[in-house]
């Protein structure tokens, strides 16, 4: 990440520190349906090499009551990573999604992106992303599907442009595996994340905490109090049938 981009992100993060609070003013105990099951109202795509809001190949669309992340209109991936951003930033909340992987990976997708997606949390404002930027600076809750045999955990952590602490130690490793089981095939998986501003994150699946860490921060050490939420497109088709959020005090 170059120095110019770091300066851009500092400004974006500071703006989130100001605007994240209003989105958490809704009553605690009431789940908000971020996805209404009908259309993408409240969501904005950012596809690499495209302007914000432009998704000419319809990577993100709604059909049969689910958000479909698909590549029917692509010939080849060509590193066109995409993210679907919710309209409001958040700081303290519990996020729940139901997701699954379908079909085959698009030609040209990187090997590591097979049956791979993510929830990008505490992210930068998409309006500050460069046109050719691949991922928003964020805390990524990595969603992975199994290959039919062997172990491949989900709800892992990746840190594009960020760092976290775990048990009092600053971690510089880009991705850290959770303790989840492996989910093969096209089964629906329910994933939850508890987020407490700059204090801690907990990844939860099947009622069990499979990963937790503290002090999400930018590469320069500035703590992240909140930010954007986005869903990822990384070359393998997937679906989200529920995206809901519970504000926490």
Task: Describe the role of every protein-language-model region.
Residues 22-249:
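Carbohydrate-interacting regions of secretory-pathway proteins
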Residues 1-12:
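Bacterial N-terminal signal peptides that target proteins for export
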Residues 13-22:
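Hydrophobic h-region of N-terminal signal peptides that target proteins for export
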């Amino acid at each position: 990440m170059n120095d110019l981009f770091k300066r851009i992100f500092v400004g974006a993060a500071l703006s989130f520190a100001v605007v994240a609070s209003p989105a958490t003013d809704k009553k605690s105990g009431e789940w908000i349906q971020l996805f209404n099951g009908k259309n993408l109202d409240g969501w904005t795509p950012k596809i690499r090499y495209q302007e914000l809001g432009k998704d000419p190949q319809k990577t993100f669309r709604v059909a049969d009551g689910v958000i479909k992340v698909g590549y029917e209109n692509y010939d080849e991936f060509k590193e066109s990573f995409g993210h679907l951003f919710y309209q409001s930033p958040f700081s303290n909340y519990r996020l729940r999604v139901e997701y699954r992987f379908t079909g085959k990976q698009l030609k040209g997708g990187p090997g590591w992106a097979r049956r791979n997606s993510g929830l990008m949390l505490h992210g930068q404002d998409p309006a500050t992303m460069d046109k050719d930027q691949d991922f928003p600076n964020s805390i990524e809750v990595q969603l992975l599907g199994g290959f039919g045999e062997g172990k491949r955990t989900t709800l892992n952590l990746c840190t594009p442009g960020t760092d976290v602490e775990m048990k009092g130690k600053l971690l510089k490793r880009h991705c850290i595996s959770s303790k989840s089981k492996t989910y093969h095939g096209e089964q629906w998986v329910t994933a939850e994340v508890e987020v407490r501003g700059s204090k801690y994150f907990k990844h939860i699946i099947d009622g069990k905490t499979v990963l937790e860490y503290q002090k999400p921060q930018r590469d320069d050490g500035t703590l992240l109090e909140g930010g954007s939420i986005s869903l990822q497109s990384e070359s393998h088709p997937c679906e989200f049938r529920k995206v809901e959020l519970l504000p926490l005090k």
